[in-house]
């Protein structure tokens, strides 16, 4: 699998000699200590903050991509507690976005139908956006970013106000869509195992990047940046040390069964 996005020797006020790559069609999670630079990093990838000769889309410096080409490759939603809808309902929002895409009427209709169904928003399209829940607004915001079928979706802090069940549902929706590379940030490690890779930032540097399970086994590195293991992962690793379980067990019922064998 090829790297769709690569950061090479990034040096600025926030990062020093940062090197990291993201594989195509994988889901990548970035977390770390407070003020570790993860939100700034997403803004750099999204082109909100300029960066020259450091970020590459399939070996092409994104700073040289024309704005139209950049907007077709990237979609992003940075959650900061507020939303930026233009119209009073989702139906108008979607149709407005579709007006800017070079699609036939049948393609527009199909995209409208498919995305609203996948995101579970079909019955809320004519409701006032102000009446939607935070979860519905977050799903709607991300759905709008996917109307132009970007190759890369950048998400910052979208899980912050969601329950674990809502967060997992959102990740499941994005996986069902397929064909996109997701780079997302989170405050903690609770959702780490829902992703394909996990990167830990600290003070503008990359501490570790690997498969989530391998990173979660790096106790000393996680402790240095003040991150705590998810409860079931922590319990599994301790029990595995004493040969009470063979691997990480995330389901509590399965854990009980394993211990009673």
Where are the regions a protein language model picked out?
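ABC ATPase C-loop
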Residues: 145-146
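The feature captures the beta-strand-to-loop junction immediately N-terminal to the Walker
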Residues: 31-33
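Conserved beta-strand-loop-alpha-helix hinge in the C-terminal portion
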Residues: 205-232
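Helix-to-loop junction immediately C-terminal to a conserved catalytic motif
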Residues: 46
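Conserved ABC ATPase signature
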Residues: 128-132
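Q-loop/switch helix immediately C-terminal to the Walker
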Residues: 76, 80-82, 86-103
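Conserved ABC transporter NBD signature motif
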Residues: 50-63, 70-72
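Conserved ABC ATPase "signature" region
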Residues: 106-124
């Amino acid at each position: 699998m090829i790297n769709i996005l690569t950061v090479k020797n990034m040096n600025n006020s926030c990062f020093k000699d940062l090197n990291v790559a993201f594989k195509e069609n994988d889901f990548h999670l970035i977390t770390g200590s407070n003020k570790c630079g993860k939100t700034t990093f997403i803004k750099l990838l999204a082109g909100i903050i300029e960066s020259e000769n450091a970020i590459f889309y399939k070996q092409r410096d994104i700073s040289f991509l024309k704005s139209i080409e950049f907007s077709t490759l990237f979609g992003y939603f940075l959650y900061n507690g507020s939303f930026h809808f233009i119209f009073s309902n989702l139906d108008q929002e979607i149709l407005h976005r579709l007006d800017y895409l070079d699609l036939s009427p049948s393609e527009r209709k199909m995209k409208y139908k498919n995305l609203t169904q996948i995101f579970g928003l079909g019955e809320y399209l004519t409701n006032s956006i102000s009446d939607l829940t935070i979860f519905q607004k977050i799903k709607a915001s991300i759905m709008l970013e996917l109307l132009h079928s970007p190759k890369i979706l950048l998400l910052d802090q979208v899980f912050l106000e969601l329950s674990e069940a809502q967060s997992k549902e959102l990740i499941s929706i994005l996986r069902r869509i397929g064909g996109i590379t997701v780079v997302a940030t989170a405050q903690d490690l609770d959702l780490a195992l829902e992703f394909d890779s996990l990167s830990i930032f600290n003070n503008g540097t990359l501490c570790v990047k690997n498969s989530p399970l391998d990173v979660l086994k790096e106790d000393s590195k996680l402790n240095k940046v003040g991150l705590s293991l998810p409860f079931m992962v922590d319990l599994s690793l301790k029990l595995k040390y004493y040969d009470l379980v063979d691997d990480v067990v995330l389901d509590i019922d399965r854990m009980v069964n394993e211990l009673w064998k």
